[in-house]
Regions:
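Short acidic, glycine/serine/threonine-rich loops at helix termini
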Residues: 2-12, 107-110, 123, 130-136, ...
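Adenosine-phosphate binding glycine-rich loop
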Residues: 192-300
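Glycine/serine-rich phosphate-binding loop and adjoining beta1-alpha1 elements at the start
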Residues: 1-90
Length: 300
């Protein structure tokens, strides 16, 4: 489901200016003049074409904030994780990617810009294994040439062969960025055994036995490696909504993207202050989030 192509036309046909109009009315209780201004910011900011070359690959298609921001946040969560927990950059780190839709392909692109190499991509119809690692240009080409939300390349091998090989490649980073509930315990075991250090959830509830929150596989992964939960890693679009609901929000690419990056960094900083160990990130983050919600609920 695409926000710009699918959701907004439906809500507009129902007389709403923006899908977040209920939040503006109910949560913020905005006055009429302020409400119109905030809804205008939401309409403009989400659909804004990204022009700053730092945030978009140059190509024939115009890309909006809504197309790029979630994948950007996923990549930034990994970059901030390495900086905060290990004092390292992404230079020379390796990654495998599950999916090649907006989130997965954008995350892969931003990871390469930060210095990482993509050594494997697995998509529904096949995948690519490149143990030397793909940098900015090859990944940009794959990003620009995807067919809808699907990987499209003459270098693709079958799904079966990719699935057999990719989990044991020894990538530092894994981005589950396809549908929910796909990642299995044997896949997690193979990644742990081959040295994977961090999983950043581009997909919501990516593990096969997840329910509303973490199932057994997610809990296990959280004890064995660094698992950045979906509500931090892929909060990009939700955070853009919150940013655009501020009065007089600056509607530049830099301001919007930087706000998402800093929000993710702050969340990981809070987790690290509470629990400095690089395991248990998801459990700790959920505990902190629930505490904040309880405070709000109780009126503190």
């Amino acid at each position: 489901m695409d926000e710009l192509k699918d959701v907004i036309p439906i809500t507009e046909s129902l007389g709403l200016w923006h899908p977040q109009e209920g939040i503006v009315n109910g949560h913020f209780k905005s006055q009429k003049g302020e409400k119109i201004k905030i809804l205008g910011q939401l309409r403009h900011g989400c659909a804004k074409i990204v022009e700053d070359p730092r945030f978009v690959p140059d190509g024939p298609h115009k890309l909006a904030v809504a197309d790029m921001i979630t994948g950007y946040g996923v990549a930034e969560s990994v970059r901030h994780f390495y900086d905060l927990y290990h004092g390292e950059s992404l230079e020379g780190k390796t990654a495998i990617i599950q999916g090649w839709g907006n989130v997965a392909s954008a995350a892969a692109s931003y990871l390469t810009v930060a210095g990482a190499k993509i050594i494997g991509i697995i998509d529904a119809a096949g995948g690519i294994i490149d143990t030397k690692g793909m940098g900015i240009e090859p990944v940009k080409k794959l990003f620009l040439e995807k067919k809808g939300n699907k990987l499209n390349s003459p270098d693709m091998i079958s799904f079966e062969e990719t699935n057999e090989k990719i989990w044991g490649l020894g990538a530092d980073i894994f981005i589950p960025g396809a549908a929910s509930k796909l990642v299995t315990r044997p896949q997690v075991d193979a990644m742990i055994a081959s040295g994977t250090r961090v999983i950043a959830c581009g997909a919501n509830v990516p593990f096969v036995d997840d329910e509303v929150f973490f199932g057994p596989t997610a809990n296990y992964a959280d004890t064995q490696l660094s698992l950045i939960p979906d509500f931090i890693a892929n909060c990009g679009m939700a955070r853009v909504f919150a940013y655009l609901m501020q009065p007089d929000a600056e509607l530049t690419d830099e301001a919007i993207f930087d706000d998402v990056s800093q929000t993710i960094r702050k969340a990981l900083t809070d987790v690290k202050q509470y629990r400095p160990d690089p395991t248990g990130i998801s459990t700790t983050a959920l505990e902190l989030a629930l505490k904040k919600l309880m405070k709000v609920e109780m009126g503190h």
